[in-house]
Amino acid sequence: LKSKDLINWEHSTVNFPTRYTKEWKNVIRVWAPETIYDKKAGKYMVFYSLRTSDPGSFDKIYYQYANEDFTDLEGEPKWLFDAGNATIDGDIVYNENDQLYHLFYKQESGRGIFQAVAKNLTDRWRMLDGNVEQTKEAVEGVGVCKAIDGKSWIIMYDCYGSGHYQFCKSTDLKTFEFVQN
């Protein structure tokens, strides 16, 4: 979606099976798209979870760059990250303190929200140990943003079995403190 006034919106669609008729013809889902500005490439990266119906396939995070007027995607999907099993709901932020990109994601087999880091967006991502969420509930849909104080981060995720979001706070993106449901 694109808007000049946040009231009227223009909609663009990319149908993967009809647009990419060779390698991506068996796509069964593309979901949880997010964007981040790639300073190195000088354009917006759109990243999303994608799965095909091919044998042995599982959800992985792929990316493409948006065109200049943000109405289409350039090129074919490129692999960005997976944890070796279904990996969905990615969100990426850049932390100026450690000069790393932090990818937060749901790992289906690990049951929870995990994190990986990279120096550049398209580098190989290094998985970090431990869960991010501060609950035993099933979670998904992680979102991360800078707090209004400009010094800390807010991490939120959907506790989908209970019908609420939970919020945590972090000053270093390594340790996470429960704030509220």
PLM regions: where:
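Beta-rich carbohydrate-recognition and catalytic domains
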Residues: L1-V30, I36-A138, A147-N181
